[in-house]
């Protein structure tokens, strides 16, 4: 399966298939320097795939291999500075391509390195997780600060995205469920039919763990995101809808140190409660609690914290404006809206969420 973005210029292919990594051979031919930024865990789990990637370069090219941790500890100024200095010491040129092999963290980090070193060099995303089907498309790259996630970054398109489905076969269930949250989010943005289809396909942990038919939903999720991003690349309008579940999600992720997708699913649940409170919707909260529990999401983490630190984190969200905290809420399935939510409603909704989960 292959998609091509439809921007006015600088379009790139998104290739989704088994053994997609072989496409690197042709893509890398124009470059003098090739830099692989690789998740150490991926190299350990699938050394033959990494070797396959490395063999795509020619003897005439300068190849650099940098191995980093595939978690949020990599997305720091310290690691960023270390990688930048190491590459500059290798005297890389503007005729360089950086290849990010790993999950969303690696894509975010390597993309930010590519966007900033020598005022920008090309990079290729090779996502190895389900979660990265979302982050590898759309051109957002960045690193974290002590104040929150992704607060330093850029909009910077890759040269290509190679989604090699072979990588998914080694994922633990924690990674599968984390990635599924973004796939499910895209279904909610699409409408009731898409929601019913995905909940029917993956009713419980056993079904999701099997990965059967997941590639179909990955493609739909990528297409959903592309349709929005191409219309609003720099998040001035509709692209904000892709942050469904992320305002509260980023806060609980940072506070409880849980996987991104698990936090997003909790954030989706929270926004249903806020929507019922603020928009007079009638979402069946117990339906979502039961469904998320069937998929083994750690909803109980909400009981391990209180509201004040979460509010402080939500107050730093990039979507906010001078009127306060902005959230993406569903007026109904498939109809998102960005709306200002006051602290009183946020706190009341948090208390309601905790009561549901006690």
Curated annotation (Swiss-Prot):
Any Pfam family: DHQ_synthase
Keyword set includes Magnesium: no
Location within or outside the cell: Cytoplasm
Recorded catalytic activity of this chain's protein: 7-phospho-2-dehydro-3-deoxy-D-arabino-heptonate = 3-dehydroquinate + phosphate
InterPro entries named in the record: Dehydroquinate_synthase, DHQ_synth_AroB, DHQ_synth_fam, DHQS/DOIS_N, DHQS_C
GO biological process terms, semicolon-separated: amino acid biosynthetic process; aromatic amino acid family biosynthetic process; chorismate biosynthetic process
Cofactor binding summary note: Binds 1 divalent metal cation per subunit. Can use either Co(2+) or Zn(2+).
Binding site for Zn(2+): 182, 246, 260
A GO cellular-component term linked to this record: cytoplasm
Binding-site list for NAD(+): 104-108, 128-129, 140, 149, 167-170
Molecular-function GO terms, alphabetical: 3-dehydroquinate synthase activity; metal ion binding; nucleotide binding
Keyword Metal-binding: yes
Principal location listed in the UniProt entry: cytoplasm
Keywords on record: Amino-acid biosynthesis, Aromatic amino acid biosynthesis, Cobalt, Cytoplasm, Lyase, Metal-binding, NAD, Nucleotide-binding, Zinc
Co-factor requirement: Co(2+); Zn(2+); NAD(+)
Known role: Catalyzes the conversion of 3-deoxy-D-arabino-heptulosonate 7-phosphate (DAHP) to dehydroquinate (DHQ).
Name the record gives this protein: 3-dehydroquinate synthase
């Amino acid at each position: 399966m292959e998609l091509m973005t439809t921007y006015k210029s600088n379009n790139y292919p998104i290739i989704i298939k088994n053994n997609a990594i072989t496409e690197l051979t042709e893509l890398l031919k124009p470059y003098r320097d090739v830099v692989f930024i690789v998740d150490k865990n991926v190299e350990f789990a699938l050394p033959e795939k990494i070797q396959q990637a490395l063999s795509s370069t020619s003897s005439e090219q300068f190849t650099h291999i940098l191995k980093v941790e595939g978690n949020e500890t990599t997305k720091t100024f310290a690691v960023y500075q270390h990688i930048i200095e190491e590459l500059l010491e290798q005297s890389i040129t503007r005729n360089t391509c950086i290849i990010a092999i790993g999950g969303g963290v690696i894509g975010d980090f390597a993309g930010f390195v590519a966007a900033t070193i020598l005022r920008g060099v090309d990079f290729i995303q090779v996502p190895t997780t389900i979660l990265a089907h979302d982050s590898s498309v759309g051109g957002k790259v960045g690193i974290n600060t002590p104040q929150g996630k992704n607060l330093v970054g850029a909009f910077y398109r890759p040269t290509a995205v190679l989604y090699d489905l072979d990588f998914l076969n080694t994922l633990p269930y924690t990674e599968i469920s984390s990635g599924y949250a973004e796939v499910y989010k895209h279904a909610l943005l699409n409408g009731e039919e898409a929601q019913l289809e995905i909940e029917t396909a993956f009713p419980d942990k056993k079904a999701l763990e099997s990965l059967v038919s997941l590639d179909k939903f990955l493609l739909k999720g990528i297409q959903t995101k592309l349709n929005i991003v191409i219309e609003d690349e720099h998040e001035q309008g509709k692209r904000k809808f892709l942050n469904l579940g992320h305002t509260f999600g980023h806060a609980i992720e940072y506070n409880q140190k849980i996987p991104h997708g698990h936090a997003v699913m909790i954030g989706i649940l929270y926004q249903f409660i806020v929507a019922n409170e603020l928009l007079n919707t009638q979402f069946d909260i117990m339906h979502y609690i039961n469904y998320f529990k069937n998929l083994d999401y750690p909803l109980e983490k909400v009981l391990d914290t209180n509201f004040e630190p979460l509010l402080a984190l939500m107050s730093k969200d990039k979507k906010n404006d001078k009127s306060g905290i902005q959230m993406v809420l569903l007026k109904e399935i498939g109809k998102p809206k960005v709306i200002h939510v006051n602290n009183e409603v946020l706190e009341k909704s948090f208390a309601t969420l905790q009561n549901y989960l006690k």
